[in-house]
């Protein structure tokens, strides 16, 4: 029941927030103009994906507040902070633009800090820090690339979320189950928006 509550909240937030956010982005002129590297051919609104992060963060917060995640709560908190920071960086990139060097450097810093925090919390070897840092920075870039392909971001997020949720159930890791479920729910709700690419 608590898992359904958290996932449901993530779903509703990700589904409904774009209704209010898209008009704001239109007024601000946050647009993606197609070029030779683009995967789309029409002008689309940028930055709407931050509503997915809002849904995931709401779901994770509820997993802590309701007691769904009773142990390893610090892992959920670290994940939430990492998601919030990465989403903020992505929003700044969409809204103002960042140089490749600055963006890559900040992504790497996020990866280092996030992985180090997880390694310390989970009492793992610090050799995982460089691996995790590169993996996180690389994954953010892959996600950014997929963002312009019709529907692939939503489908990918659902698949990854379900995979982690199932892994959490099989491994009896409540934090992983909760994180996977709210991620899948948030991306599922955003899929109709992602399929439309939100043309102006």
Which positions does each model-derived feature cover?
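"…together with the soluble PPM/PP2C metallo-phosphatase catalytic core" -> "…together
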Residues: 1-198
